[in-house]
Amino acid sequence: MTISPPERGSDAKSQVEKVDNPATFELFGKPGHFDRALAKGPKTTTWVWNLHANAHDFDAHTSDLQEVSRRIFSAHFGHLAVIFIWLSGAFFHGARFSNYSGWLADPTHVKPSAQVVWPIFGQEILNGDMGAGFNGIQITSGLFHVWRGWGITSETQLMALAIGALVMAGLMLNAGVFHYHKSAPKLEWFQNVESMLNHHLAGLLGLGSLSWAGHLIHVSLPVTKLMDAIDAGEPLVLNGTTIASAADIPLPHEFFNQDLLAQLYPGIGSGISAFFSGNWAAYGDFLTFKGGLNPVTGSLWMTDIAHHHVAIAVLFIVAGHMYRTNWGIGHSIKEIHEGQKGDPLLFPAPNGHDGLYEFMTTSWHAQLAVNLAMLGSLSIIVAQHMYAMPPYAYMAVDYPTQIGLFTHHIWIGGFLIVGGAAHAAIAMVRDYDPAKHIDNVLDRVLKARDAIISHLNWVCIWLGAHSFGLYIHNDTMRALGRPQDMFSDQAISIQPIFAQWIQNAHAAAAGSTAPNALAGVSEVFNGSVVAVGGKVAAAPMPLGTADFMVHHIHAFTIHVTVLILLKGVLYARSSRLIPDKANLGFRFSCDGPGRGGTCQVSAWDHVFLGLFWMYNSLSIVIFHFSWKMQSDIWGTVNADGSVAHITNGNFAQSAITINGWLRDYLWAQAVQVINSYGSSTSAYGIMFLGAHFIWAFSLMFLFSGRGYWQELIESIVWAHNKLKVAPAIQPRALSIIQGRAVGVAHYLLGGIATTWAFFHAHILVVG
C-alpha cells in the first residue's frame, strides 16, 4: 500500500449543488424537447426515427460533461424504478396466479406455473396440467426455485414483496427527480473514483453480501433445512411441534429468537462472542465447506452458499479500504495507472498508461465499454454455473428452466459484449484526443492495429477452414459409407485432452489440493450421478471427438465476432481507405456520393455486422448445450441405477456431421413444436411460425436499397395527391442506417423468438 504524507489528503467539501430546475410535464410532453431541430415538430416521417435515435444520446443534447453525467445518473434511478415494477409484477403473479404452495409441497411432481389464461375464444387450451389439480402455463424462469432459496413459504409473503417492490419503485423515481431537479452532484463527485470504489466495494458489494449472508443464515437456512426434511420424509421438530408442511414453518421474524434457530443449528447458540474470541469453529455447522450437491434437492448446500457470502463480504470490505480519499493513505488510481510503463521487449510503450486515467474519467463511453464487456462475460459465466453448480433447490431437475436460464444468460452476455464494442467505438470517435495519448498503451495498440487485425483475420480463416473442414470430411465419408475413415470416437479419435485434464484435476481436488472440501466443485467434472425424484440432477459429462469438433466451431465464430467488433473500434477514427473517418462520426452509411465502395465502414456498421455474428456464434452454443445435456446428462434413473437419457446418448455419433446436426437435432427436436396444435403448447407452434415471419421480414430491409423504397413512396404519394388525401407530414424512405437498424432488430427478434418456441415446445413435452 502506498502511504503518503498527510498533506496528500484532501478536505471533505460539498460535492452537491442545489438546483432550481423544476420538473414540468409541459416540457416532457413536448416530443423532441431535447433537440432544437426535433423540437420544431415533424415535417417528414424521418422525424420519428431521429426522435428514437437521439432521445437517449445525451452527448447530442449538450456538450457539458457535468450535465451529461447528471442525466445519466438520474436515468439510472429511472431504470431501477422500472426494474422494481417488473419485479413487483413477478411477485404479484406468484402471489395471485401461481401454484407456488402446491409446488413447494411436491416439487418433483408439480410443475411451476404463475399464469392462468382466461377463456375468451378458446385459448384456455394453453392451461396445461401442472399436477395437484392446477392448470396453467408452465414457467421456466426459475422464480419458484429462487423464492424457496430466499425462504419464502407462502403466497402472502409474495404479495408483501409485490407491494414492497412498488414502494421501492416510487422511491427510485423520487430519487431520480430529486438528484437532477433539486440537488444534483457536481462533476467532481462523478470523477472521484477512489471514493466511488470504496463505496461500491465496501458498501454495495461488501455490506450488501454481508447483509445477504445475514438473511441466508437467519431466514434461508432454517426454512430450507425444515423444507428439505419434509421433502425427505423425515420432518424435524421445533419447540415440540412437528414441522410437517410449509404452513407449519415459523415466520421469518420468529427466527429472531436465537433459541429457535439453535435447535436447528447449535452453532448459532454460541452467539457473537465466538466470533470475537476467535472460536470460529463454533460456526462450522451453518458455515460449511462441503462441496457437491444436496442429495434431497440437487442444489448447492445452503450452508456453503451462506459461507460463500460471508467470505465475499470480508474480501470486498477489505477491498473497499484500499483507495486514497480524504486521508493520506491508500492507493491512487491515477498513480497506479502512471506507474505502468509496459514491458520493454514485448510491449514497448514509453508512456505506459499515461492519459488513460483522464480518458476513463472524462469519457462515459470508455467507462461503459469496459463495464459492458466485463458484465457480458460474467453473464456467460453465470450461464455455465446454472447447470454445473445449480444453486437453487430442484432447479437441476426442471429441465425447461435449465435450458431457459442457460439460453437467457448466454444471449444477454452476447448483447452486452457487442454493446461494449459499440461504446468503445463511440468513445474513440467522440472522446479520444490523439494529442493526449502519445506513445501510451492505447496509442501503441492503434499503431499496431494492422498487425492485430490481419493476424486475427488469419486466425479466423485457420479456425474456420479446419473446424468446418472436419465436418465436411465427416459428411463426405458418411455419405460414401466409409465410417472407418471418419473423425469419431470409434474411428479417427480426436480427444479434448486439455478439457479432460481439467475435469480430472477438479475431481481429484477434494481431500488433496482442497483438503477441507468434502466433495468436488461440480459433478460435471467426473463426479457421480445425483438423482432427485428419479431424474438426473447432475452427472459427469463425458467429452469426446464430437465435443472437440463443435468446440472449435465455437472458437471460430467467437473469433470472427471479435474480429468485426475490434476492427470497428481500432478503425473508428481513421483507416487507409477513409483517413478522416473521425469527422464523419460514429454512424454514416457511405463516404459521400463522390466515392464508391466506401459503404459499411462506419463504427456503427461494425456493430451492425458484429450483431449477426454474435447471434450466429451463440445459436451454436445454446444448440450444443441443449443437445449435449439431453444426450449425455439429463434423463430418468432406472431401478438398476442405469440412466435412460432423453436422446439416448446420440450426441457423440450424430454431432460429428452437419447432416447429423440437421437431422438428429434440429429436425428431430422440432417434432414437438410442429405438432403442437391442439395441445397446451400450441402457442409455441404459432410463435415458431410467427417468429420465422419476423425473421424473414427483416431480410426485406437488409437486402434492398433506400432508393427502391423512395421511388415506390413517391408513386404512392402521387396517387394520394390525385385523390386529394395527401398527408401533411411528407413520407420518406428510411435512411440506409435506419433500414439496417430495423433489419437487424427484426432479424435478432425473429431468430431468438424462433429458438425460444423451438426449445420450449420440445423440452416442456419431453423434459
Swiss-Prot record:
Location (main, coarse): membrane
Keyword Iron-sulfur tagged: yes
Membrane topology of the entry: Multi-pass membrane protein
A biological process term (GO) from this entry: photosynthesis
Spans traversing the lipid bilayer: 72-95, 158-181, 197-221, 305-323, 364-387, 403-429, 451-473, 548-566, 606-627, 681-703, 741-761
Pfam families tied to this protein: PsaA_PsaB
GO molecular function, one term: oxidoreductase activity
UniProt entry keywords in alphabetical sequence: 4Fe-4S, Chlorophyll, Chromophore, Electron transport, Iron, Iron-sulfur, Magnesium, Membrane, Metal-binding, Oxidoreductase, Photosynthesis, Photosystem I, Thylakoid, Transmembrane, Transmembrane helix, Transport
Binding site for chlorophyll a: M700, Y708
Superkingdom as given in the UniProt entry: Bacteria
Binding-site residues for [4Fe-4S] cluster, renumbered to this chain: C590, C599
Homology family: Belongs to the PsaA/PsaB family.
SUBUNIT field: The PsaA/B heterodimer binds the P700 chlorophyll special pair and subsequent electron acceptors. PSI consists of a core antenna complex that captures photons, and an electron transfer chain that converts photonic excitation into a charge separation. The cyanobacterial PSI reaction center is composed of one copy each of PsaA,B,C,D,E,F,I,J,K,L,M and X, and forms trimeric complexes.
Cited function: PsaA and PsaB bind P700, the primary electron donor of photosystem I (PSI), as well as the electron acceptors A0, A1 and FX. PSI is a plastocyanin/cytochrome c6-ferredoxin oxidoreductase, converting photonic excitation into a charge separation, which transfers an electron from the donor P700 chlorophyll pair to the spectroscopically characterized acceptors A0, A1, FX, FA and FB in turn. Oxidized P700 is reduced on the lumenal side of the thylakoid membrane by plastocyanin or cytochrome c6.
Alphabetical list of NCBIfam families matching this protein: psaA (TIGR01335)
Protein name: Photosystem I P700 chlorophyll a apoprotein A1
